Amino acid sequence: MKTFVAKPETVKRDWYVVDATGKTLGRLGHELARRLRGKHKAEYTPHVDTGDYIVVINAEKVAVTGNKETDKLYYWHTGYVGGIKQATFKEMIARRPEAVIEIAVKGMLPKGPLGRAMFRKLKVYAGSEHNHAAQQPQVLDI
């Protein structure tokens, strides 16, 4: 018996919608990364993108435990000398709530071209409205 290897053209990808309201950031991110990668499928193949499309709504209502709301810091650099910037979780949620989930999930995906392809299948929205109704996403309870 030969080992099954999925081919990119034969992979069936589904669309799911996830409500982030009250979900813990890390636990939600772990499950999203797992499904974007396709590890929940029997035909998972490490070097082929077998994951599904995921639409996350209500990103502004994601939760963190402990004091992370004020203690967790996000860093970025502007590209100029002395241009290091930082913001707390609370400031990031106020400024751009989608980025919080995107950063968490991106760090859990493989680095390189395959990881970037997986990340492109993640669609995050701050509110409850999304423009992927034509894909008829199924509700995924995490």
Swiss-Prot record:
Entry keyword annotation includes Ribonucleoprotein: yes
One Pfam family from the record: Ribosomal_L13
Gene Ontology BP terms: negative regulation of translation; translation
Keyword Ribonucleoprotein belongs to the record: yes
GO cellular component term, pick one: cytosolic large ribosomal subunit
Record keywords: Ribonucleoprotein, Ribosomal protein
PROSITE patterns: RIBOSOMAL_L13 (PS00783)
Disulfide bridge map: none
Gene3D superfamilies for this protein: Ribosomal protein L13 (3.90.1180.10)
GO molecular function, one term: structural constituent of ribosome
Role played: This protein is one of the early assembly proteins of the 50S ribosomal subunit, although it is not seen to bind rRNA by itself. It is important during the early stages of 50S assembly.
Family, as annotated: Belongs to the universal ribosomal protein uL13 family.
NCBIfam families, per the entry: rplM_bact (TIGR01066)
Subunit details: Part of the 50S ribosomal subunit.
HAMAP family for the chain: Ribosomal_uL13 (MF_01366)
Protein name: Large ribosomal subunit protein uL13
Gene coding for it: rplM
